[in-house]
Every structure is written in structure tokens, then in C-alpha cells.
């Protein structure tokens, strides 16, 4: 199913990719680490759903701990929403997590479906960490993480029943990425994307969106670009959901927590002014 693991030179082909890999190799933000320590699932995405009001009740000295646990619950809920849209997955199917971070969503997918999951990342640190998590859980024979480029994964054509990207497409050319996903998906296969995208209706990107780009060393795409790239690569949307309103409570909670990074205000500003959307796109390979 897999090929020889490529060298760093083959994986990181541009100066931009090298800078992104370096960022994530060095990244140890408490907002990712402390939340993962709650139950051992390490996410690199944001949360969805209403905040449990009990977080703000109880002793002040344990309030931040309650906030950490609640943010982690909301991030896990986001991954569940993504997995809900992968369609009918059998234990014999193979899935791909493109931009797999520290492995949380891949591990959840295996737990839910019992199938094989491969994750790819250009961060060697993330790959090593995620493989360690799979080994600790005794699922390393079913869940594997690879130091590879999602634009050229090396996996066999039509080998995947479903693929997802969870807040990773802002690091790649959409036409190249969706071309690779189209190659990997079997006919009728499912692609699910959750992403932040700029609002074409507003014209040029806002100051808040530009600050998000600068913070994460990424390139947020306009909403229209996603649908152009999908259409060009035989990926036909079946469901599009604006999750913006559902993620705002998470960001408002995070802004009050001890793990706030300073990017919370730009996110909240961009969401509330309408220049930025949190979108889920579900598409089938035809």
C-alpha cells in the first residue's frame, strides 16, 4: 500500500514548505499540548458548539482547568462532525488524513470505523509524535503517520474510500491538492474539508484575515477558490455548511483562557465582521 519513505528534500520542495515545516516542528503551544493532555487526543483544529455554562461555576482556582477541558471537548466535537460526514466506512476501507498534525482525528476515525488510516504531514516532529500515540494505543498496525507532502503522497491510485483535511488547505495550492485527492479516491469516494476561508463578497482580504495568515505562516484562500478547484478535479459537493456561528463560542472561551495565543481577537473580529468563514465542504469523487 505504501512506497519507500521519501527524503526531506523530496518532501519539502519549496522555501514556503520548508518554513511551514519548521514552524510546526518547533511548535509547542500550550493550547495544543495542554488540551491534548486531558484525554490523550491531540488536536490541531478549533472547536464547535455551545459552551457548557457550568465552566463558569465553581471555585475560581479551578476555573482555568474547567476551561481547558471544555475547549478540548469542543475540539473533539468538531472532529466528530467531520467524521459524521465521511459516509459509510467499513473496517476494510482505507482513509487518508491530509495534514494530520499530532494524530487526534485519525485515531478517532480508527476507533469509530475500525479501518486503516494513514496520516501525512510535512512536520517530522508531528509525525513522530502521532506515531507514538498510535503505538501507545496499540493501533500502530492500523493507524500510521508519514512524513510526506499531501500534494504527492505516494499512495496508490484509487486506494482511499475517504479523505479529509481539517484546517490544512491554507498551506497548499488547492488545484494541486484536490488533484492528488481525486487520484487517491476510488470512484464514489468522499472528501471532507473543514477550513477557514475569506469572503469574496468583501473584496480584498481584511486586516484581521491578514493577521491570521501572518500568525500561522499560511495563505487563506477565498471561498470561491475551493469550488473552482473541486470542479476542476471531479470532486462534486453534496453538502456545504457554514460553521462560523458554531465556532465563535469556542473562540470567546479561548480568549479568556490561560492558553490564549493572541490570535483570538483577529479570529473573532474576522468572523463577526463577515470577512472570514469557517466552512465544511463535503464532496464526492465522480
Question: Which residue stretches match the model-derived regions?
Answer:
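A short glycine-rich, Lys/Arg-flanked "PGG" loop and its adjoining helix->strand segment in the class I
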Residues: 176-190
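Short alpha-helix
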Residues: 218-234
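Short, glycine-/aromatic-enriched active-site segment of Class I SAM-dependent methyltransferases
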Residues: 196-217
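A short acidic, Gly/Pro-enriched loop at the edge of an enzyme's catalytic core
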Residues: 151-163
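Class I SAM-dependent methyltransferase SAM/SAH-binding core
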Residues: 94-96, 105-147, 151
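Conserved alpha-helix/loop element of class I SAM-dependent methyltransferases that forms part
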Residues: 52-58, 72-91
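Conserved catalytic loop of SAM-dependent methyltransferase domains
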Residues: 239-260
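N-terminal auxiliary segments of SAM/dcSAM-dependent transferases
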Residues: 1-42
Amino acid at each position: 500500500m505504501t512506497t519507500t519513505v521519501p527524503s526531506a528534500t523530496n518532501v519539502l520542495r519549496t522555501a514556503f514548505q520548508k518554513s511551514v515545516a519548521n514552524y510546526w516542528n518547533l511548535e509547542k503551544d500550550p493550547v495544543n499540548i495542554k488540551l491534548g493532555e486531558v484525554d490523550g487526543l491531540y488536536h490541531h483544529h478549533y472547536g464547535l458548539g455551545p459552551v457548557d455554562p457550568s465552566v463558569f461555576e465553581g471555585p475560581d482556582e479551578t476555573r482555568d482547568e474547567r476551561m481547558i477541558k471544555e475547549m478540548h471537548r469542543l475540539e473533539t466535537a468538531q472532529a466528530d462532525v467531520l467524521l459524521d460526514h465521511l459516509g459509510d466506512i467499513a473496517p476494510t476501507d482505507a482513509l487518508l488524513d491530509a495534514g494530520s498534525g499530532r494524530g487526534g482525528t485519525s485515531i478517532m476515525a480508527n476507533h469509530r470505523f475500525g479501518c486503516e488510516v494513514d496520516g501525512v504531514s510535512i512536520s517530522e516532529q508531528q509525525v513522530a509524535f502521532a506515531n507514538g500515540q498510535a503505538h501507545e494505543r496499540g493501533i500502530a498496525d492500523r493507524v500510521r503517520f508519514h512524513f510526506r507532502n499531501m500534494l504527492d503522497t505516494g499512495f496508490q491510485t484509487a486506494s482511499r474510500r475517504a479523505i479529509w483535511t481539517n484546517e490544512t488547505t491554507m498551506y497548499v495550492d488547492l488545484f494541486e491538492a484536490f488533484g492528488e485527492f481525486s487520484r487517491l479516491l476510488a470512484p464514489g469516494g468522499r472528501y471532507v474539508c473543514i477550513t477557514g476561508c475569506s469572503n469574496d463578497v468583501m473584496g480584498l482580504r481584511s486586516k484581521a484575515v491578514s493577521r491570521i495568515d501572518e500568525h500561522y505562516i499560511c495563505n487563506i484562500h477565498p471561498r470561491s477558490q475551493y469550488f473552482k478547484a473541486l470542479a476542476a478535479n471531479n470532486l462534486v459537493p453534496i453538502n456545504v455548511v457554514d460553521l462560523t456561528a458554531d465556532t465563535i463560542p469556542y473562540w470567546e472561551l479561548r480568549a479568556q483562557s490561560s492558553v490564549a495565543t493572541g490570535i483570538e481577537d483577529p479570529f473573532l473580529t474576522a468572523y463577526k465582521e463577515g470577512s472570514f468563514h469557517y466552512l465544511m465542504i463535503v464532496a464526492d469523487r465522480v
